[in-house]
């Protein structure tokens, strides 16, 4: 029986939702992760520092008594966002990043940015104070194929943004393509990139081959196998600009299993077990800690966690949690399509 002890990991891209779903899922992240960057795409979105403070209180109230989990709050960038409010939130220690959603790119992004020029005054302030911009990197131009939207975003939006504001610290969130990996590698230390658990495991065949599988549908959508392999190479490389952002995104099953299903994969309960499998498969268990526990804090200029966790590998496959109940309904947990042998020890 094999064990691996690492610093406690963090999740640099997490959806906890609100209300009954928040109550049902929060502990699944808190069980393994010390901190998480919390996405602000609620309805209505988390736009102001006051909104973020209130949401943080709701998250803390959803955790078990004595939980040490720390939600790291973000603001949703709109064309009417107030630079002074954002700076005040950052100076107070509450706000750790601002999230750019191109309008219509993903779940609850209708209030996002349609014209990047309109938010440059805010971006300039963020660059000045050192506040990171987390970017959902897809164009929403209907003429662009869904599988090309990340590459086109890099060309149309990210490259001009980098030229105009090279001092702005940017996180390319949930990169899904070799184009994204290569762009991140070509940039200086002001650019980092998160990679999700599921994009290391599935390609687009998982969604489309042999029938529609809605629980593998997410945005950005999984791409072809060559891109998945590029993501794996980046994640296991030890390169400091790549770090874990699970993009765990719960939706109730009826909202996934329908004619027009929601995008999102709920992987919080089994992420660390899945990642241990991936890194073991790649002969890179010695670099799992860098990806999950060291690179993200370094980019966000936070200390790594002092606490350690131990992962244990069992000879026989372990039973995996399949569903999380939310009242009379349920959320399906990500199925990696391989037997789970690793477990975070209590």
Swiss-Prot record:
Pathway: Pyrimidine metabolism; UMP biosynthesis via de novo pathway; (S)-dihydroorotate from bicarbonate: step 3/3. The active site is at residue 247. The gene is pyrC. It comes from the Bacteria. InterPro entries: Amidohydro-rel, DHOdimr, Dihydroorotase_CS, Metal_Hydrolase. Its EC number is 3.5.2.3. Belongs to the metallo-dependent hydrolases superfamily. DHOase family. Class II DHOase subfamily. This is Dihydroorotase. Homodimer. Pfam families: Amidohydro_1. Zn(2+) 2 binds at residues 99, 136, 174. Zn(2+) 1 binds at residues 13, 15, 99, 247. Its cofactor is Zn(2+). Coiled coil: none annotated. The modification N6-carboxylysine is found at residue 99. GO terms for biological process: 'de novo' pyrimidine nucleobase biosynthetic process; 'de novo' UMP biosynthetic process. Binds 2 Zn(2+) ions per subunit. Catalyzes the reversible cyclization of carbamoyl aspartate to dihydroorotate.
């Amino acid at each position: 029986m094999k064990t691996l002890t690492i610093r406690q990991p963090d999740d640099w891209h997490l959806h906890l939702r609100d209300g009954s779903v928040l109550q049902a899922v929060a502990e699944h992240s808190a069980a393994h992760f010390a901190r998480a960057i919390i996405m602000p795409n609620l309805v209505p979105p988390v736009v102001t520092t006051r909104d973020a403070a209130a949401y943080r209180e709701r998250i803390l109230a959803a955790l078990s008594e004595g939980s040490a989990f720390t939600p790291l709050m973000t603001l949703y960038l709109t064309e009417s966002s107030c630079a002074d409010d954002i700076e005040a939130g950052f100076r107070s220690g509450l706000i750790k990043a601002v999230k750019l959603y191109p309008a219509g790119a993903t779940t609850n992004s209708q209030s996002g940015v349609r014209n990047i020029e309109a938010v440059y005054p805010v971006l300039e302030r963020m660059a000045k104070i050192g506040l990171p911009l987390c970017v959902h990197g897809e164009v929403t131009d209907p003429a662009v194929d869904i599988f090309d939207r990340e590459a086109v975003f890099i060309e149309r939006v990210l490259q001009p943004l980098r030229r105009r504001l090279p001092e702005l610290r940017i996180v390319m969130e949930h990169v899904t393509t070799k184009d994204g990996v290569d762009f991140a590698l070509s940039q200086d230390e002001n650019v980092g990139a998160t990679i999700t658990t599921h994009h290391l495991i599935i390609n687009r065949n998982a969604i489309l081959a042999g029938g529609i599988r809605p629980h593998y549908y997410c945005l950005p959508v999984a791409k072809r196998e060559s891109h998945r392999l590029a993501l794996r190479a980046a994640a296991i490389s030890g390169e400091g600009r790549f770090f874990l952002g699970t993009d765990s995104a719960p939706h109730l099953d009826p909202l996934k299993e329908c004619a027009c299903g929601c995008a999102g994969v709920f992987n919080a309960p089994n992420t660390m077990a899945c990642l241990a499998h991936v890194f073991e498969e790649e002969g890179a268990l010695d670099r799992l800690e860098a990806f999950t526990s060291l690179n993200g804090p370094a980019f966000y200029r936070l200390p790594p966690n002092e606490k350690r966790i131990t992962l244990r590998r069992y000879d026989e496959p372990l039973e995996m949690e399949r569903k999380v109940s939310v009242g009379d309904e349920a959320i399906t947990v990500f199925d990696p399509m391989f037997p789970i042998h690793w477990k975070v020890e209590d």
